[in-house]
């Protein structure tokens, strides 16, 4: 009989980080559960914590989901915090393109309704995570 062990990943504030960073971490990791789509899955089907937010080649709709880490070539490393906050408000990408796929609904029904402070807190957190070379 095989037994699989899954780690429960509860979000806890980091006392060594700012209130803004902790708010962003909370919104990304707990409330928004961004990693459910933006993190690749392990062989057992759970999100791979070693590649957190590094993009998913086959997301929930079977399509590629973007790397949202600060990787300069494969992620959003060239985006400013303002670029990220603006994208979460209206879906506009820095290059003039628009959000597509499931992110349209996420933006319309969720992130566009956040306060500016919360959108900037998310941006601050995303700029701080380790860059991932995936997707």
Language model features with spans:
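Protein kinase-like catalytic domain
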Residues: 38, 89-92, 130
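Electrostatic cytochrome c docking/interface patches
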Residues: 1-30, 76
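Small/polar (Gly/Ser/Thr/Ala-rich) solvent-exposed segments
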Residues: 42-53
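The canonical Cys-X-X-Cys-His
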Residues: 24, 31-41, 84, 122, ...
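Ligand-binding pocket scaffold of soluble enzyme catalytic domains
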Residues: 95-98, 114-121, 128-134
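Electron-transfer interface patches adjacent to heme c in soluble/periplasmic c-type cytochromes
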Residues: 51-95, 107-119
């Amino acid at each position: 009989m095989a037994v699989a062990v899954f780690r429960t990943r509860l979000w806890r504030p980091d006392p060594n980080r700012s209130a803004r960073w902790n708010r962003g971490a909370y919104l990304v990791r707990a409330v928004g559960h961004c990693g459910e789509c933006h993190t690749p899955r392990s062989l057992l089907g759970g999100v791979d914590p070693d590649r957190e937010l590094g993009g998913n080649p086959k997301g929930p709709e079977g399509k590629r989901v973007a790397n949202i880490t600060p990787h300069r070539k494969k992620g959003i490393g060239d985006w400013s915090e303002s670029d990220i906050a603006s994208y979460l408000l209206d879906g506009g990408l820095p290059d003039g393109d628009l959000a597509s796929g499931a992110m349209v609904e996420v933006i319309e029904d969720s992130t566009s309704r956040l306060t500016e402070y919360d959108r900037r807190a998310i941006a601050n957190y995303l700029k701080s995570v380790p860059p991932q070379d995936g997707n």
